[in-house]
Amino acid sequence: MEALFLSSSSSSIVASNKLTRLHNHCVWSTVIRDKKRFGPTWCRVGGGGDGGRNSNAERPIRVSSLLKDRGQVLIREQSSPAMDAETLVLSPNGNGRTIEINGVKTLMPFSGASMVGMKEGLGIISFLQGKKFLITGSTGFLAKVLIEKVLRMAPDVSKIYLLIKAKSKEAAIERLKNEVLDAELFNTLKETHGASYMSFMLTKLIPVTGNICDSNIGLQADSAEEIAKEVDVIINSAANTTFNERYDVALDINTRGPGNLMGFAKKCKKLKLFLQVSTAYVNGQRQGRIMEKPFSMGDCIATENFLEGNRKALDVDREMKLALEAARKGTQNQDEAQKMKDLGLERARSYGWQDTYVFTKAMGEMMINSTRGDVPVVIIRPSVIESTYKDPFPGWMEGNRMMDPIVLCYGKGQLTGFLVDPKGVLDVVPADMVVNATLAAIAKHGMAMSDPEPEINVYQIASSAINPLVFEDLAELLYNHYKTSPCMDSKGDPIMVRLMKLFNSVDDFSDHLWRDAQERSGLMSGMSSVDSKMMQKLKFICKKSVEQAKHLATIYEPYTFYGGRFDNSNTQRLMENMSEDEKREFGFDVGSINWTDYITNVHIPGLRRHVLKGRA
C-alpha cells in the first residue's frame, strides 16, 4: 500500500491511489510532507464521528470526495466518492466546503505496526501491548490457552482481570495458583521467567471474585469501578458445556450470564470490544452449509424454513421463567434433577436444537445481540475443541473433551463399536488455533474506530467444510495408534484392540454391545464352574456396561449424525489480512491440518499423558 496523505488542517491533503479499509468506511493514513512524517491519522469516507460513545476518541476527518485528476479541481458530493484517487478533496468540517491540494510527488508508505493490509498485517502484538482485559471462565481449558498465548507473545500487556467464582480474594488467588499457574501448559513461561515466574504472572493476572450469573457479574463495588474505568476488551469464556445439564443451571450461565456481562460492558468507558466464545453447534439442527450469521432475538431453527407468517418465535425471557418455576416446584433429589434435565432437552428439541447446551448458548448469543447497543461485538464459534496443535507445545489437553471418552474407552478395550454415520464428519479444531483466531479477531475489530452502529461479527472456527475428518477414517487412525502403542491392563499386559465397528442403526449397535459385553465377561463361554451368584453379578456388570455405552451414544447421536457443515468464509478472510509473520505465530489454517499426524502423534499421546497421566 502507498500512503494516504492527510492533515486535519486545510493543507497537505493529497492521497495515493490505494486506500486500506480498517473497519467499514475507516482508512488508516499518514501525513508526509517535505520528507517529514507527521504520524498516522484516519478518516471516514462520507463523514462519521464516534457516535458519542467514546468522548476521548480522535475526531475523524470527513472526506468530501476522493477523485483522480491532475490538472483541475473536481468536486463530488459526499454521497459519491471516487475511491481511485491521487488527489484528495476534503471538507475538514463536514460543511460541504472543499479544498484541494496537489503537487506532492513522492508517496511514502507508513510503517506503523497497526495498519491493516500492509506487511504488518493485523498488528496483533501491537494491539495487545498495554491493553487491559477482563476474562471470564479463566480456569477453563480454552481460557488458559488464551492467557498463556497472550503473556508469552505480548508480555507487556498491561493487566488481565480474571473473574473467578470464589468466597474471598484469597480463595480466588488460591484457585488461580492451583488451577492456572501450576498447569503444565505454562512451562514455557516458567522457563522464560525462571525464578520470577510467579511474580510476573501475579503482576499481570488480577483475580477478582465474581460470577456472571449474578447482577453486576458479582463484583464488589470497588472492583467494578476500577475495571469499568480501565478495561479495553472483555472476553466471555464462561460456560456450562454439559449436553444434558439441568435446564435452570444451563440457562443461568449460558444465557443469563452473557446478558449480565453485557450489562456491565456498557458501563466500561474505554471498552473497544466484547468477545463471546460460543460454539458452532449453536446452529442446532440446520443442514448443509451453515453460514456465519448472528442470531436475532426470537430466532427459531425448527420453523425458520416456514413462511414468515407461520413462524413460532422463541421467547427467551419465557424460557428462563419456565425453568425457574420448574426448579422452585421441585426438590433437590435425584428424580427432580433428572426432570430438570429432561425439560431442557425437550425445550431444546422443540425449537430445533439438539441439546440443552447448544440451545442455551444460542439464547446467550441472542441476549448479547439484543442488548449490545453501541458495544462492538465479536462472536467466536469453534466446533469441537481438542488438544493443542503446536503452541505452546503439541498435545496439551485438560479434561475429557467431546470425543475423548470414546477414544480412551476404545484404547482400554472397553468400547469396540459406536453409533455413528461412518461417512459422517467429526468437526474438530485444535485449541491453539481457536485462540489464534480469537486474538486475530480482537486485533482487527478492537483497532476499528468507533462506529455509531457497530456490527456484530461472527467467526466459525471449524474444519468440516474445508478439511473434513470422516468417522471411518478416524476409526482407522485410532486402531493404528493403539495397535502400535497399546494401553496396559492392571497386570502390565498390552490391551489389544480390533478395528472399531461403526453402526448407523440403534438396534444393531445394541445387539453388538450385548454380545461384546458377554464375550469380555466370559458369559458366552458357558462358565459352568461359576456359581449362580457370580453369574448374576457378571450379568449385572454386562447390563450396566451396555447401558452406559448406549447412554453415551444417545448423548452424542446428534453430533455423530450431524448434517451441517460450518462455513468459515469470515475466518478465511480474517486470515488473509494477516502478515506472513502473524500467520506463523498466530496461524489458524485448519485446512493445513494433517489428521493422520494430529490424531495419532499429537492428540492421543496428549490425552494419555495429560488426562490419563500415563496410567494407561
Swiss-Prot record:
pH dependence: Optimum pH is 6.
Expression across tissues: Expressed in the tapetum of anthers.
Example GO biological process: response to herbicide
SUPFAM superfamilies per UniProt: NAD(P)-binding Rossmann-fold domains
Induction: Repressed by imazethapyr (IM), a herbicide of the imidazolines family.
Feature: transit peptide: 1-14
Molecular function GO labels: alcohol-forming long-chain fatty acyl-CoA reductase activity; alcohol-forming very long-chain fatty acyl-CoA reductase activity; oxidoreductase activity, acting on the CH-CH group of donors, NAD or NADP as acceptor
Cysteines paired by S-S bonds: none
Gene Ontology cellular-component annotations: chloroplast
Keyword set, alphabetical order: Chloroplast, Lipid biosynthesis, Lipid metabolism, NADP, Oxidoreductase, Plastid, Transit peptide
EC number(s) reported in the record: 1.2.1.84
Catalytic reactions on record: a long-chain fatty acyl-CoA + 2 NADPH + 2 H(+) = a long-chain primary fatty alcohol + 2 NADP(+) + CoA; hexadecanoyl-CoA + 2 NADPH + 2 H(+) = hexadecan-1-ol + 2 NADP(+) + CoA; hexadecanoyl-[ACP] + 2 NADPH + 2 H(+) = hexadecan-1-ol + holo-[ACP] + 2 NADP(+)
Motif NAD(P)H-binding: where in chain: 133-143
Disrupted-gene phenotype: Male sterility. Very thin pollen wall with abnormal exine patterning.
Top-level lineage group: Eukaryota
CDD domains per record: FAR-N_SDR_e, FAR_C
Compartments where found: Plastid, Chloroplast
Family matches, as Pfam families: NAD_binding_4, Sterile
Thermal activity profile: Optimum temperature is 30 degrees Celsius.
Active site residues according to the UniProt entry: Y357, K361
Homology family: Belongs to the fatty acyl-CoA reductase family.
Function: Catalyzes the reduction of fatty acyl-CoA and -ACP (acyl carrier protein) substrates to fatty alcohols. Triggers the accumulation of C16 and C18 fatty alcohols; converts palmitoyl-acyl carrier protein to the corresponding C16:0 alcohol with NAD(P)H as electron donor, but seems inactive toward palmitoyl- or other acyl-coenzyme A. Also triggers the formation of some C16:0 aldehydes. Involved in the synthesis of the lipid component in sporopollenin. Required for exine patterning of pollen grain by mediating the formation of pollen wall substances.
PANTHER family: FATTY ACYL-COA REDUCTASE CG8306-RELATED, MALE STERILITY PROTEIN 2-RELATED
UniProt protein name: Fatty acyl-CoA reductase 2, chloroplastic
